[in-house]
Amino acid sequence: MRAANATTGAVRRLFLIATEESGDRLGAALMQALKTRLGDGVVFEGVGGRAMAEQGLVSLFPIEELSIMGISAVVRRLPSILRRIRSTADAVLGAKPDMLIIIDSPDFTHRVARRVRVRDPSIAIVNYVSPTVWAWRPGRARAMRRYVDHVLALLPFEPEEYRRLRGPPCTYVGHPLTEQIAHLRPSPAEQARRDAEPPVLVVLPGSRRSEIHHLMAVFGETLGRLQAEQGDLELILPTVPHLRDAVEAGVRDWPVQPRIVVGDADKKAAFRIARAAFAKSGTVTLELALAHVPMVAVYKAGAMEAWIGKRVIRSASVILANLVVGENVIPEFIQEDCVPDRLVPALREVLADTPMRARQLEGFGRIDDIMSTGAQTPSGRAADIVLNVLRKH
């Protein structure tokens, strides 16, 4: 076993792996929280992006190498991905850290973790962001006991799922979105705009090029028909800098033109005045729920992903906000249901003062208490558990 007490003055060596932008942000916040607690008594190595680099991490390779989505894309890149898994595991073993912290991206990070645990069991392993064992492949939870010492969960229902599935110890540390609530809730003037005419509809067709490819046509046709039936609408489409070109190309043939805004601040500003949202399923549904914006959510994948998904997904909903609230308050339209004939009536209903809209708002009103972490930030709670695992390992 390695030296176990973070208060002894020994320098802690931590190896972090985050291969997506969201994980990079989580990793950076965790690094900052650990530096607050340990000062110069911690050294970081690993894989990360821009945010973790700002905290001092020199990444083994650019995480953009792994920013792929979809089974067909993974198959094409499989040889290079497997090489990266092997080389990353070798780098961890060569660094001999006190702990390996794997952040999200389980198809990559868990393969690294398994290799490390087999070859050097003395390295503690913490998994930050639970794989979706509650949605599909529940057997992963029990298998993780062999190579994960603790899971840091972002969603409040996940620890109970790990207990039920006999997985490793799991603690809810909080979702980083809960730290943004003050920036998501409207001022009195913004609330007045929410209630004014024409209504603002926020349009969110996805955060990856593959998602935009699958959804832009159905979004455009749906919004054209909605405006023809509903009358005037103000459409705002938030995106990120590296997707702006794809979004602008995708809306060019739409019968109605949204106002495109770029960046997180403008996205939150749009949420604060939005009457409703039309969104691709994902983390953004939880962000909209925390902003108290009723929505219609959709998901449409490629043919192969859809075929597999129908056979393995076991959760009652694919919408994060529904899972957190504990009931399906947000209507979801998946694959063959993701068509204008179904979407237009749902959007009309969520824009109007209807029981469906009221039910969503009532559910969203409970989210603050459900997701609360008290006075401590999610990154602070995560850092404290990391240190506790180090003491015990």
Swiss-Prot record:
The family note in this entry says:
Belongs to the LpxB family.
Source organism of the structure:
Rhodopseudomonas palustris (strain HaA2)
For this UniProt record, give its keywords in alphabetical order, as a comma-separated list: Glycosyltransferase, Lipid A biosynthesis, Lipid biosynthesis, Lipid metabolism, Transferase
Entry's EC annotation: 2.4.1.182
Q: What cellular component terms from Gene Ontology apply here?
A: membrane
Entry protein name: Lipid-A-disaccharide synthase
Q: What is the lineage of its organism?
A: Bacteria, Pseudomonadati, Pseudomonadota, Alphaproteobacteria, Hyphomicrobiales
Job of this protein: Condensation of UDP-2,3-diacylglucosamine and 2,3-diacylglucosamine-1-phosphate to form lipid A disaccharide, a precursor of lipid A, a phosphorylated glycolipid that anchors the lipopolysaccharide to the outer membrane of the cell.
Class of the enzyme per the UniProt entry, highest EC level: transferase
| Pathway where this protein functions | Bacterial outer membrane biogenesis; LPS lipid A biosynthesis
GO biological process terms held by the UniProt record: lipid A biosynthetic process
N-terminal signal peptide: none
One GO molecular function term? phospholipid binding
Q: Which NCBIfam families match?
A: lpxB
* Catalytic activity of the protein: a lipid X + a UDP-2-N,3-O-bis[(3R)-3-hydroxyacyl]-alpha-D-glucosamine = a lipid A disaccharide + UDP + H(+)
Pfam families in UniProt: LpxB (PF02684)
Q: Which domain of life is it from?
A: Bacteria
Name the gene.
lpxB
**The keyword Lipid biosynthesis belongs to this UniProt entry's keyword annotation:** yes
- List, alphabetically, the PANTHER family matched: LIPID-A-DISACCHARIDE SYNTHASE, LIPID-A-DISACCHARIDE SYNTHASE, MITOCHONDRIAL-RELATED
